[in-house]
Structure formats: C-alpha cells, structure tokens
C-alpha cells in the first residue's frame, strides 16, 4: 500500500479527513455490508476467515461473535487499534488484528477457508491488484472461498479522484487468473449518509438515499473458490 494512501485512510479513521463530514468514515456502518451479511447467513463462510482490508472490522467481529476464528488485516494503524478495542469490549479471543500491506503480506500460508474483501478491492491502486491476489492466494487453504464487494465503474463519473471501481469483465479478468469464479452479480454498497457533502453524491449514477439514513451505490458481488 502506498504511503499517501495509508495516510488518507489514517486521517479518515481519526476523523480528520477534510472531505469527511462525520467522525467516522462513511463506510463504517457498524455491521457487515448487507450483501456480505446475506452470504454469511447462507452459510458461504467456512474455516478460518480473513477480513482483508478490515477497517474497523465489522465483518470479522460479527463472524467471531458467531464462533468463527477470524483475522483482520489493514494498512491503517488507527483502524486496527479501533478493531482491537471493539474485540476487547466484546470479550472476543477468537479474532486477531494486525497492520499489514494487503498487497504484500506473509505469515498465513494456506490458512484461510474464506477470504472476504468488503470494499477493499476498489480502495487500492490498480497496480497493486496483482500483488494483492498473489498474497491472498498464498494465504488461502485448498477449497477456499473468496468473496468481493466492489464499486461498479459505471456508477462513477470518469473524472473521479478516489476509488478505483471496476466493470464486470474487468473484475472477472483479474480474479479468474487466480480463482475459479462462480458468480458475479449486481450489488449495493452502503454508507452513512451524513458522511457525504451536500450535492456531491448527485454526480454518481444509481445513488440512493435509504430509509435508515444510509445511502447506497451500485457495485458487484463476486463469489469464487480455489480448487
């Protein structure tokens, strides 16, 4: 992960990002993303779980509370500090967290039965994707599942400065080099509505204001596995 990108996420988790209107980053919604939650409830998670680019680790914490052994990795030390604090508050001993470059990490070879990427994929520079895929494949156990929730490129204006969303063919091409892709389907990604500046969200296609104060945008939900 580049130093500038790490600094950007650090300022977000500290509540210091100039474009951030709320104390927490808009993507920190206090629970797993609903699309990920559906797959968890459908029994798509097995074995030890890697929450890749975990942030404040809502997914890893949720799974640990339900008996899974989970690991959360993120490049932002403040996010990891927050995640460790939440785990301690809940008395969870089956989840661990560490600061790591998700595009080049070691120490977990062949461990994880499920790897979950909840909005990480579009958060890293394009040039880091290959290293990221190689790192998580190295960490995957035989038969591992890989789940990705990522922004759809069609929902973003072409001059956007920030995330790196993907088209369905682009996502399939990248992931299929390393995994057997089982499904890619349209999805929604949710965020706290108070984290957006007035009028700024109207530049995005398929932007929705939800009844619970969240907002949502179009994305892709990928499911894949290792043979």
UniProtKB/Swiss-Prot annotation:
Record EC number: 2.1.1.374
Keyword Flavoprotein: no
Gene Ontology biological process: methylation
Reactions that this protein is recorded to catalyse: 2-heptyl-1-hydroxy-4(1H)-quinolinone + S-adenosyl-L-methionine = 2-heptyl-1-methoxy-4(1H)-quinolinone + S-adenosyl-L-homocysteine + H(+); 3-bromo-2-heptyl-1-hydroxy-4(1H)-quinolinone + S-adenosyl-L-methionine = 3-bromo-2-heptyl-1-methoxy-4(1H)-quinolinone + S-adenosyl-L-homocysteine + H(+)
Enzyme class: transferase
Keywords per UniProt: Cytoplasm, Methyltransferase, S-adenosyl-L-methionine, Transferase
Localization in the cell: Cytoplasm
Coiled-coil residue windows: none
GO molecular function annotation: methyltransferase activity
Classification via InterPro entries: Methyltranfer_dom (IPR025714), SAM-dependent_MTases_sf (IPR029063)
Cleavable signal peptide: none
GO cellular component entries: cytoplasm
One of the Pfam families matching this protein, by short name: Methyltransf_31
Function: Involved in cellular response to chemical stress and may contribute to resistance toward antimicrobial natural compounds as well as drugs. Catalyzes the methylation and detoxification of the P.aeruginosa toxin 2-heptyl-1-hydroxy-4(1H)-quinolinone (HQNO) to 2-heptyl-1-methoxy-4(1H)-quinolinone (HMOQ). Can also methylate 3-bromo-2-heptyl-1-hydroxy-4(1H)-quinolinone, and shows much lower activity with 1-hydroxyquinolin-4(1H)-one, quercetin, 4-hydroxyquinolin-2(1H)-one (DHQ) and 4-hydroxyisoquinolin-1(2H)-one.
Family in the record: Belongs to the methyltransferase superfamily.
Subunit text: Monomer.
Name of the protein this chain belongs to: 2-heptyl-1-hydroxyquinolin-4(1H)-one methyltransferase
The species this protein was found in: Mycobacteroides abscessus (strain ATCC 19977 / DSM 44196 / CCUG 20993 / CIP 104536 / JCM 13569 / NCTC 13031 / TMC 1543 / L948) (Mycobacterium abscessus)
Encoding gene per record: htm
């Amino acid at each position: 992960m580049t130093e500038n990108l790490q600094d950007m996420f650090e300022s977000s988790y500290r509540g210091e990002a100039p474009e951030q209107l709320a104390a927490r980053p808009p993507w920190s919604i206090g629970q797993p993303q609903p699309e990920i939650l559906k797959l968890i409830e459908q029994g798509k998670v097995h074995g030890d779980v890697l929450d890749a680019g975990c942030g404040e680790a809502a997914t890893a914490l949720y799974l640990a509370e339900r008996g899974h052994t989970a690991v959360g990795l993120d490049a932002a030390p403040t996010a990891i500090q927050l995640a460790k604090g939440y785990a301690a508050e809940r008395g969870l001993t089956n989840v661990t967290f560490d600061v790591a470059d998700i595009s080049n990490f070691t120490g977990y070879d062949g461990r994880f039965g499920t790897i979950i990427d909840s909005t990480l994929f579009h958060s890293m520079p394009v040039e880091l994707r290959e290293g990221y895929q190689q790192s998580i494949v190295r960490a995957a156990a035989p038969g591992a599942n890989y789940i990705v929730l990522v922004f759809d490129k069609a929902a973003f204006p072409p001059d956007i400065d920030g995330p790196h969303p993907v088209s369905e063919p682009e996502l399939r091409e990248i992931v299929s080099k390393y995994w057997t892709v089982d499904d890619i389907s349209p999805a929604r990604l949710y965020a706290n509505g108070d984290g957006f500046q007035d009028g700024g969200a109207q530049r995005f296609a398929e932007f929705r204001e939800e009844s619970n104060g969240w907002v949502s945008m179009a994305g892709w939900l990928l499911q894949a596995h290792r043979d």
